[in-house]
């Protein structure tokens, strides 16, 4: 690469080194394309550095502390002390190891790595600004470009993130002490995961949510299981309230919310975590220079090959819209790289799993019963309660269920919903089933190891056929 006015070229340019971007870059290089990856921060993106990995590390650590306190029924007695600074240091070590791993994978694949912020000059050129003022820039021409710039936490008007009083999820994951009182605005998956973490670590947690329940978009019986467990942890929920304003106090902050009747409620807390969703990051790309439009949510529209309105420009991951999931971004990155290399490729949305790492976990894939009906199917349902699974009881778990949705006529698997221990691991079998066109008999006819949680998947499929043995 030459710094200055000279333009150098690459066949495949990837902007953003998160899950979608680094996978696209590695696959492009493996397919023989001269590939360049531009990243302005840390390799691995939000997922690895400020999202999926660090949050799950803290979830695991908080589970250890909580489980130790709850082990008396198993004849184990302990009173663990929490060192949040030490926990954060351990979490950061995990992140550093994986970030270095991603960089190493890219280098080993032959990907050219460039640090900086890329913006489009035209539909065949970007300018990359390196670091801060005086660090210089360079121009890169490309045959194909893949935009994978990810997303960032959305702020509530008047509640801009300051890292001290008003926290984003990124800020919350970097805390070195447990807040005595934590107010969480938003009861979606991020708000619920982090509320659970800090409640288990000893914080007094209050959640306010505009809607009438936790986890908007999930079925009521799933949300109920998670909300009930959260309330057992001491989390206080207040629904139908919107954050309105806040002020600093001697003890921390005072937040006012307002409901639809204009009733104002005040909450005192040490810190306020705002978790109301995420928005695509496109403002650094100078999309106006190539007249590439985004929709009203800032999403770059794409086709089933992840191509934008420009044949040479692709978009993958969060900038390409919901669901904003790392594994969806990776799959799209694969598709875009193959399409750029001239290989046949298309992205299929029907079997994208999703997981929420609450207590208990939630995992879903494919259609719900109502979605199947709306799609014209006559669905049949099979459900297995967690409390009827022997292995679940041996790990002191009893709440939740495994549910499968199938077509009543042909018994093709259409979807699944799990709430319970290790749901995020169990869902893979059912995602594979949907992907390969499996029928209920394929799941029910497969011998599952005993005693394991996976037997609940087997039993749910059998229940849908009227052949359940271990549940009524």
Curated annotation (Swiss-Prot):
Keyword Oxidoreductase part of the UniProt annotation: yes
The record's annotation in Gene3D superfamilies points to: 3.30.390.30, FAD/NAD(P)-binding domain
- Fetch the PANTHER family from UniProt: DIHYDROLIPOYL DEHYDROGENASE, DISULFIDE OXIDOREDUCTASE
Please list the GO biological process terms of this entry.
2-oxoglutarate metabolic process
Protein name, entry field: Dihydrolipoyl dehydrogenase 2
Enumerate the PROSITE patterns for this protein: PYRIDINE_REDOX_1
Residues annotated as binding NAD(+): 186-190, 209, 275-278
* Pfam families cross-referenced by the UniProt entry: Pyr_redox_2, Pyr_redox_dim
Superkingdom of this protein's organism: Archaea
An example of a Gene Ontology cellular component annotation for this protein is:
cytoplasm
Where in the chain are disulfide-linked cysteines found?
47-52
What keywords sit in the KW lines? Answer: Cytoplasm, Disulfide bond, FAD, Flavoprotein, NAD, Oxidoreductase, Redox-active center
Give the EC class as a word: oxidoreductase
Q: Active site at which residues?
A: 450
Q: Could you share any additional remarks the record makes about this protein?
A: The active site is a redox-active disulfide bond.
Name any cofactors this protein relies on: FAD
């Amino acid at each position: 690469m030459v710094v200055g006015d000279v333009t150098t070229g690459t066949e495949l340019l990837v902007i953003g080194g998160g899950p979608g971007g680094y996978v696209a870059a590695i696959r492009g290089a493996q397919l023989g394309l001269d590939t360049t990856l531009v990243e302005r921060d840390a390799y691995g993106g939000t997922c690895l550095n400020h999202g999926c990995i660090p949050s799950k590390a803290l979830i695991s650590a908080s589970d250890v502390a909580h489980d130790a306190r709850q082990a008396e029924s198993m004849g184990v007695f302990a009173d663990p002390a929490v060192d949040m600074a030490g926990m954060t240091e351990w979490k950061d070590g995990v992140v550093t190891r994986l970030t270095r791993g991603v960089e190493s994978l890219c280098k080993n694949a032959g990907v050219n790595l460039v640090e900086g912020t890329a913006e489009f000059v035209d539909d065949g050129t970007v300018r990359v600004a390196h670091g801060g003022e005086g660090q210089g820039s360079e121009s890169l021409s490309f045959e194909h470009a893949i935009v994978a710039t990810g997303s960032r936490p959305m702020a509530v008007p008047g509640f801009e993130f300051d890292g001290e009083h008003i926290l984003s999820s990124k800020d919350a994951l970097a805390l070195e002490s447990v807040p005595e009182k934590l107010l969480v605005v938003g009861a979606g998956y991020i708000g619920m995961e982090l509320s659970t973490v800090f409640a288990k670590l000893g914080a007094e947690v209050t959640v306010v949510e505009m809607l009438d329940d936790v986890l908007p978009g999930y079925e009521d019986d799933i949300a109920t299981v998670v909300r009930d467990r959260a309330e057992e942890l001491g989390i206080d929920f207040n629904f139908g309230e919107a954050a309105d304003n806040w002020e600093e106090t001697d003890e921390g902050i005072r937040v006012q919310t307002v409901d639809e009747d204009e009733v104002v409620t005040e909450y005192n807390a040490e810190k306020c975590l705002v978790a109301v969703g995420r928005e695509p990051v496109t403002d650094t790309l100078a999309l106006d220079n190539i007249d590439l439009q985004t929709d009203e949510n800032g999403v770059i529209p794409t086709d089933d090959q992840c191509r934008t309105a420009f044949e040479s420009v692709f978009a993958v991951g969060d900038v390409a819209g919901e669901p904003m999931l790392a594994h969806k971004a990776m799959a799209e990155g694969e598709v875009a790289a193959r399409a750029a290399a001239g290989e046949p490729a298309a992205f299929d949305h029907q079997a994208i799993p999703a997981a929420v790492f609450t207590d208990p976990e939630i995992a879903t894939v494919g259609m719900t019963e109502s979605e199947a009906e709306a799609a014209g199917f006559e669905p049949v349902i099979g459900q297995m309660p967690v409390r009827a699974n022997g292995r679940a009881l041996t790990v002191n778990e009893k709440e939740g269920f495994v549910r499968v949705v199938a077509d009543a006529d042909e018994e093709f698997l259409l979807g699944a919903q799990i709430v319970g221990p290790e749901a995020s691991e169990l869902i893979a079998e059912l995602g594979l089933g949907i992907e390969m066109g499996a029928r209920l008999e394929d799941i029910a006819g497969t011998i599952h190891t005993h005693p394991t949680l996976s037997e609940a998947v087997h039993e749910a499929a059998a229940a849908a056929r009227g052949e359940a043995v271990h549940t009524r």
